[in-house]
Curated annotation (Swiss-Prot):
GO terms for biological process: sensory perception of sound. It comes from the Eukaryota. Residues 58-69 have a biased composition (Low complexity). This is Glutaredoxin domain-containing cysteine-rich protein CG31559. InterPro entries: Glutaredoxin, GRXCR1, Thioredoxin-like_sf. Residues 295-400 form the Glutaredoxin domain. Residues 217-227 have a biased composition (Basic and acidic residues). It comes from Drosophila melanogaster. Pfam families: Glutaredoxin, GRXCR1-2_C. Belongs to the GRXCR1 family. Residues 33-45, 70-84 have a biased composition (Polar residues). Residues 30-88, 217-239 are annotated as: Disordered.
Length: 454
C-alpha cells in the first residue's frame, strides 16, 4: 500500500497547513501500526521497496522534526526489529561458527513459520499459501541437535581410543611382569593363565589342593597303567591313593559315592568355593566305622588301598563255587587288581570273615573295598549291570590283573620252604621219640605260605 504525499500549498495560513500535515502523518502512522503491513509480509510474494521513501524528502522539507519521525516510522514498518536483530546475530555467528553448523541453522530457519493473528477469518479462508508447510521429518528433528550429537560422539570416540590404548599398555606390562616372574610363583603351574570372571578372585586360594590332587590322580592313573607290572609300582600307587585321601578328607571315605565325588566342590555365582560334596556322607561312614568293634579299625588299615574278595575253592557245593567264579570273572573283566582270600585253604581267613561279618556262619563270596563291605554275589552283579561297579572300582584298574603270577600260578599260596608242606619241625629227627609232636611254625595248618610275588 503506497501512500501519496499531498502537495504542499504555497499559500494560506501556517496553522491550517500544520493541521493538514499532522492529520496525514497521523493516518500514515495508524496504517503502519494497524498490522496490515505484517499481513502483506506474511504472503510469499517478494516485497518491493516502498515509493514513499523516495517522496519522503519532498514532504519533509517543511519541518525537519516531523520528517525524521516519519522516516523512522517507515523504516520500522518495512523492516521489523526482530528481523534486524536476527540478521545482526547471524552476521556475528557467521564469523565464529563453521560452515556446516551455519547450514544446519539455515535449514532450521526454513521450517519456521510466523503465525499471523491479525488476519481476519474470511481472508484466511480465501487466501491460499504459496508454500504448504511440511511436517518435520525425523531426520530434520535429529539435525536440530546435530552439533551436540557430534560433540558427544567425538568425546566418546576419544575416550574409547584412550581406554583401548591404556588397556593394551596394561596387558603388555602384565605380560612382561609374568614373564619376568619365575614359574614357581604360579600355584600348580597354571594359575597365571586363568581368566578370572572377577578381578578379586585372583587373591582367593581356597581348596587349591583339591585341583592339584585331581591332576595328580589322573597322572598317577596313567602311570599306573604303564608301569604297574612290577611290585614297586603297585606299592607306589597304593601310597599315592593313601596320600590323596589324607589330603582330601581326614576321616573314612564312603567308596559307594565314587572317587570323583569327593573332589566336586560347591561354588557360588562368583566362583568362590562354598563347600565340598559328600562330606556329610563321609562323616557318617567314619562314625559307623568307629562304632564297630575295636579290631575293625585294624582291618581298615590292613586293607587300605586294596580290593579284597573272600572266596572258596571247594567245589562240593556247586552253587557257592559258581558264585565265587562269577564274581572273580566280573572283576577280571573290569581289569581290577584284587586280592583273593580262600577261606577253604586258610583257617585264618575263616576267623577273619567271622569277625568282619559278626556272625558264626561264613558266607562267600564277599567283596571289600578300602576295608568297607560292598556286598555278596547278588550285589556285585546288580552294581555291574547298572555300571556303578565300574565307577566304584575305576581307581583300582590295573593292567597287571591280566597277568598270571609265574610263581604260584594265580593261587597266591606256595608250599612252605622250611618243611616243604609236611609240617614237620626242623628240630625233629628220626632217632628220638621226644620231638615227634613238634611242627613247623613258618606255615599254616596245611603247610602253605603266601606267595611272596603276589
Amino acid at each position: 500500500m503506497v501512500l501519496a504525499t499531498p502537495p504542499v500549498s504555497k499559500g494560506g495560513n501556517a496553522g491550517g497547513l500544520f493541521m493538514d500535515q499532522y492529520q496525514q502523518y497521523a493516518a500514515h502512522c495508524e496504517t503502519a501500526d494497524s498490522g496490515n503491513g505484517s499481513d502483506l509480509e506474511s504472503t510469499g510474494l517478494p516485497t518491493k521497496p516502498d515509493d514513499s521513501e523516495e517522496s519522503g524528502p519532498s514532504s519533509l522539507g517543511s519541518d525537519s522534526m516531523h520528517g525524521s519521525s516519519t522516516e523512522y516510522v517507515r523504516q520500522s514498518a518495512s523492516q521489523p526489529s526482530g528481523q534486524r536483530q536476527r540478521q545482526k546475530s547471524l552476521r556475528v555467528l557467521g564469523a565464529l561458527l563453521p560452515d556446516s553448523l551455519l547450514r544446519d541453522i539455515r535449514d532450521r530457519r526454513s521450517t519456521e513459520y510466523v503465525v499471523q493473528f491479525s488476519q481476519p477469518e474470511d481472508e484466511e479462508k480465501i487466501q491460499v499459501p504459496d508454500k504448504i508447510p511440511e511436517k518435520p521429518s525425523p531426520f530434520r528433528l535429529a539435525r536440530e541437535s546435530l552439533s551436540e550429537d557430534k560433540i558427544e560422539e567425538l568425546r566418546a570416540a576419544v575416550e574409547r581410543a584412550n581406554f583401548v590404548q591404556t588397556g593394551e599398555e596394561t596387558l603388555d606390562s602384565i605380560d612382561a611382569t609374568s614373564q619376568s616372574l619365575p614359574a614357581s610363583s604360579n600355584i600348580g603351574g597354571h594359575r597365571g593363565n586363568i581368566n578370572y570372571k572377577y578381578a578379586d578372585d585372583q587373591y582367593y586360594s581356597f581348596h587349591i589342593n583339591e585341583h592339584e590332587n585331581f591332576g595328580a590322580r589322573s597322572a598317577r592313573s596313567g602311570d599306573e597303567a604303564d608301569h604297574s607290572t612290577g611290585a614297586g609300582s603297585e606299592a607306589g600307587s597304593d601310597s599315592g591313593i593313601l596320600t590323596e585321601q589324607q589330603d582330601l578328607f581326614a576321616g573314612y571315605r564312603d567308596v559307594r559315592c565314587g572317587a570323583s565325588s569327593t573332589q566336586s566342590t560347591i561354588r557360588s555365582a562368583k566362583g568362590t568355593v562354598r563347600g565340598v560334596k559328600n562330606r556329610v556322607r563321609n562323616g557318617i561312614a567314619t562314625f559307623l566305622q568307629l562304632q564297630q568293634q575295636p579290631n575293625a579299625k585294624n582291618f581298615k588299615e590292613k586293607d587300605l588301598g586294596k580290593v579284597v574278595l573272600y572266596t572258596t575253592s571247594m567245589g562240593i557245593i556247586r552253587e557257592t563255587y559258581t558264585k565265587c567264579a562269577n564274581v572273580k570273572q566280573i572283576l577280571r573283566t573290569l581289569l581290577v587288581k584284587f586280592e583273593e582270600r580262600d577261606v577253604f585253604m586258610s583257617v585264618e581267613y575263616q576267623a577273619e570273615m567271622r569277625q568282619r561279618m559278626q556272625s558264626g556262619q561264613v558266607r562267600v563270596p564277599q567283596l571289600y573295598v578300602e576295608g568297607q563291605h560292598i556286598g555278596d554275589a547278588e550285589t556285585v552283579e546288580r552294581m555291574n549291570e547298572s555300571g556303578e561297579l565300574r565307577q566304584l572300582l575305576k581307581p583300582y584298574k590295573s593292567m597287571a590283573s591280566t597277568y598270571t603270577c609265574q610263581t604260584c600260578g594265580g593261587y597266591r599260596l606256595l608250599p612252605c620252604p622250611s618243611c616243604n608242606g609236611s609240617k614237620k619241625s626242623v628240630h625233629r629227627n628220626h632217632f628220638t621219640a621226644e620231638f615227634v609232636a613238634l611242627k613247623c611254625m613258618n606255615c599254616d595248618e596245611v603247610g602253605l605260605v603266601k606267595c611272596h610275588n603276589c
